[in-house]
Amino acid sequence: MLEVSGLVKRFGGFTAVNNVSFKVGLGEILGLIGPNGSGKSTIFNLLSGTLAPTAGSIRFHGREIAGRPPHQIINQGIGRTFQIPRPFRRLSLFDNVALAGYYGQGRHSHVRAYEAAERALELVGLPVDRDAPVTGLGAAGLKKLELAKALATGPSLLLADESLGGLDEAEMVQAAEMLRRIRTQLGLTIIWVEHILGVLMRVVDRVMVLDHGEKISEGLPAEVAADPRVIEVYLGTEADAVQAAARR
């Protein structure tokens, strides 16, 4: 479904992503992990069209999409959530999601956007009431809203950016299970960036690890957890958490 080859992104003299290549298969959940500053967000920005690569190829369903603007990427079928939700607080929950649906997959139809919003809100467990306000949503509700907006665009590939941030332990488990359930219900492919490794490693099919902009490991969770390079990057407690989660 997605094939990335030799991806490079430089900002002046700083190389944020250096010769990264990977593939994601249909229906797969790929976990993308690494320390702060390892290049995870930059790769998401390159995949979603927020940034253009310095070099390299991004092919989606066989089509080259590197350097295309975000609205074209969305219309190709790639949806994205953001780590920090920023809803339009003067709009209702429903209208926030319908607005995203309007631009997804070239709909440009109020009726189709409303239908997409209803489906997305039902999938994440938020009220479909057209007048329900955004104000008053807690961290878990805002994360659900962010996911609903991405789903309303009708993606076949979902880029999930730190879906567990700010949640308590029970909410983390629920959010992870929701991603797995939605993958099954919609036949989605998911790339999931996350820092909460203990939860992520129990859900994903494969893991890719970045450090200083380079891919240092890729494989099944148990394989990655045993990789000496990964253990070196995640010193101490985090390395133990990675290995423990991969054994479950």
PLM features per residue range, with description:
Residues 1-248:
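Glycine-rich phosphate-binding loops of nucleotide-dependent enzymes
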